[in-house]
Curated annotation (Swiss-Prot):
One of its GO terms (molecular function) is poly(U) RNA binding. Phosphorylated. It comes from the Eukaryota. Interacts with DDX15. May interact with RUFY1. The modification Phosphoserine is found at S92, S94. The keyword Ribonucleoprotein does not apply. It comes from Rattus norvegicus (Rat). It is found in: Nucleus. This is Lupus La protein homolog. The modification N6-acetyllysine is found at K116, K128, K327, K356. Residues 328-341 have a biased composition (Basic residues). InterPro entries: La_dom_prot, La_HTH, La_xRRM, Lupus_La, Nucleotide-bd_a/b_plait_sf, RBD_domain_sf, RRM_dom, WH-like_DNA-bd_sf. Residues 111-187 form the RRM domain.
Amino acid sequence: MAENGDNEKMAALEAKICHQIEYYFGDFNLPRDKFLKEQIKLDEGWVPLETMIKFNRLNRLTTDFNVIVQALSKSKANLMEVSADKTKIRRSPSRPLPEVTDEYKNDVKNRSVYIKGFPTDATLDDIKEWLDDKGQILNIQMRRTLHKTFKGSIFAVFDSIQSAKKFVDTPGQKYKDTNLLILFKEDYFAKKNEERKQSKVEAKLKAKQEHEGRHKPGSTETRALEGKMGCLLKFSGDLDDQTCREDFHFLFSNHGEIKWIDFVRGAKEGIILFKEKAKDALEKARSANNGNLLLRNKKVTWKVLEGHAEKDAMKKITDDQQESLNKWKSKGGHAARRFKGSHVFTAARRFKGRGKGNRPAYAGAPKGRGQFQGRRTRFDDDDHRRGPVKRGIDGRDREEPASKHKKRENGARDK
């Protein structure tokens, strides 16, 4: 019996080794991995196992060359080759990398899925284990805050559009009794863009109401407040420090449209303004969660506001909305945004190119025409950030041998 148990453990280890190495040399990772791409140029694609075992996730599995070679010999993917002396490995020349064309990029986007609802303390291995029977996953990106805290959501790339669609279309998927929000990546971004557009429309409408209200003092505000009675839901409890407004949108996504959330991260209570009656949204959400409506796995007290408490809260929300609108106006609204993002270079070019009459724009300026280099197009725009290419399935930056990592230990991540 003990021998059977050992054999099962070894088989599981070998499967993990194959999966990890085949990820390193796979279609998704290899084109993005600068270090590994440099290594395969040195010796006809061969990479020494001595180098490979310095990759952190493989190192945690094994450093034994024989175990690695034995594992790869049992792989059914036929992606990797082992050298005759069993000291080097390479991606099989018969399996060339796909050409990274626009068509290929679109194909990757079409089989990328957004999944939200994981606890913030979940690890990459936890998520990989949960996804094991959901289809073949080529890459997992754990989405993080600016402070590197896991946000509880991921982007996963499936091996085919069919497997991605099958996963997205499967209803009622949960992670440890927590309902998950699952969308195609493109649908997720479309949803976020629609929310931004809706916010702009609401801001314009609010501005119009305020303008009309100045001619009829109190009438517009009174009608607006009366129309929102019964739409406020107060929540309180020992909330997670990472709780954010998006969590409430997720919780009530199919039960009621949220118009405003009076809440700041780190607070223990707040108020949600629904478009329709808050009681209906609360009952629907409770029913969908078997009567136990948790927020990031924390117990929460939910209360529909009435009477003076409701009027006071509505007045505060109205004032906050007006303040937000005023700030937006003070920045110039659309005019201010014309100088942000993709068009910011137009102002800068005034000082970089030739001045009037072919003269330099300023003293000491280089002669010649200042040329805009174009917007940078990223293949993987999940985080919408610039910086080193990430090794997504590790949830870290690309791995390099420990010797190189030691040269930059001032705040660098664990490799």
